[in-house]
Regions:
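Conserved mixed alpha/beta catalytic, RNA-binding, or beta-rich assembly cores of soluble enzyme
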Residues: 197-234, 238-239
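Ligand-binding beta-strand-loop-alpha-helix segment within the catalytic cores
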Residues: 124-192, 196-197
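N-terminal, Lys/Arg-enriched amphipathic/low-complexity engagement segments
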Residues: 29-65, 69
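A generic, well-ordered mixed alpha/beta core segment in the N-terminal half of proteins
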Residues: 86-150
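Short glycine-rich or small-residue beta-strand-to-loop segments that form or flank ligand, phosphate
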Residues: 72-82, 103-105, 240-245
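C-terminal functional extensions of proteins
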Residues: 227-230, 237-240, 247-323
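N-terminal amphipathic/basic leader segments beginning at the initiator methionine
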Residues: 1-36
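Glycine-rich phosphate/diphosphate-binding loops that line cofactor/substrate pockets in enzymes
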Residues: 59-73, 187-191, 230-237, 322
Length: 323
């Protein structure tokens, strides 16, 4: 006999309902279908189950297609690993197909892209060079980027445009770039697709170079923030903002832009946001997926996966289903 004062409840009189009456949120009509050989990416997409992330992924594909059809903004916010994963050719192809009306980079993404154009390689072995202080000390990267920024401020242009222009001018002087065809900064500049670069002083390696000019860096990135706010106004009613691989800086920049745009009286509602990353972090979730849609309609999606898999898959789905 139990020594506890409490006795187990008797379920004899518990009221039950029929399974038919209860129903269910998951139905066989929502199940996946086996992949059919030769059906391509479009067939694969159609074969996915109609649940959770699969539905979210399809919704992002449809939102991108709708934004292009309605000539609304398609803005790609990206961290450095998107560039380091070798995705520039995929993104540039999407740009040429009308699936990118602007690129929004943090400092890391800009550095890696600039180095790819300059030298055909990027990304240091930090553990190998940090002990003796060589990390971030590349001469050409620091010199060329800082010079471009200073000249851009002098000429009244932002950081993204200044970096793209500098790479273009290097090519015009005799093909000094090793891999210009792989640069977002350069090819977007040539296509007149805006690129904005958003930095925090001290987070990026060019900031420790002797040529770094804090006033110029601040002025250039602030101008780009104002330009980004202008791009955000074009999200209204049908645009889409994708945050890919920036866990803190760009989600904060985006939220401030949304607030500034609305504060200035621009309508901003009924647009789509999506966060792509291999982990779903707090700030992208609240600042990109959730808060911008409070009391304003629209929808936010969180897609979890590695950039080198998810972005080519997204591009392939767009090309096959909405060429």
């Amino acid at each position: 006999m139990s020594r506890y004062a409490q006795q187990p409840l008797d379920f004899a009189n518990l009221k039950t309902v029929s399974l038919e009456e209860r129903g269910g949120k998951v139905k066989v009509a929502d199940f996946a279908a086996p992949y059919q050989p030769g059906s391509g990416v479009a067939g694969l997409l159609d074969s996915l189950p109609h649940v959770l992330a699969a539905d979210s992924f399809r919704a992002v594909v449809d939102a991108l297609a709708l934004a292009r059809r309605q000539e609304r903004a398609i803005l790609w916010g990206m961290g450095g690993h998107v560039v380091k994963c070798g995705l520039a050719p995929v993104l540039l192809d999407l740009m040429r197909r009308g699936y990118a009306t602007g690129f929004v980079l943090n400092g890391s993404a800009a550095i890696h892209d600039f180095e790819i154009a300059l030298a055909g390689h990027t990304s240091e072995d930090v553990e190998a060079v940090l002990p003796d202080g060589r990390f971030g000390a590349a001469e050409e990267t620091g010199r060329e980027m800082n010079q471009a920024i200073v000249e851009g401020v002098r000429d009244g242009i932002g950081m993204g445009e200044a970096l793209g222009r500098a790479l273009d001018q290097r090519d015009q002087r005799g093909g000094r770039n090793r891999a210009p065809e792989f640069s977002l900064l350069l090819n977007a500049y040539r296509a007149r697709v805006p690129v904005t670069v958003h930095v925090a002083i001290g987070t990026d390696t060019p900031h420790i170079h002797p040529a770094a000019d804090g006033a110029a860096i601040g002025s250039a990135t602030h101008r780009d923030f104002r330009l980004f706010c202008s791009l955000v106004t074009e999200l209204h009613q049908g645009g889409i903002y994708l945050n890919v691989g920036s866990a803190v800086l760009l989600p904060e920049v985006f939220l401030k832009a949304v607030s500034a745009v609305r504060n200035l009286g621009h309508p901003l509602a009924e647009f789509t946001t999506a966060n792509f990353d291999f982990l779903q972090h707090y700030r992208p979730r609240v600042n990109v997926v959730e808060r911008p849609h409070a009391a304003s309609g629209g929808k936010g999606y969180a897609i979890t996966g590695h950039h080198e898999l998810m972005i080519p898959l997204l591009a392939a789905a767009l090309i096959e289903k909405h060429p």
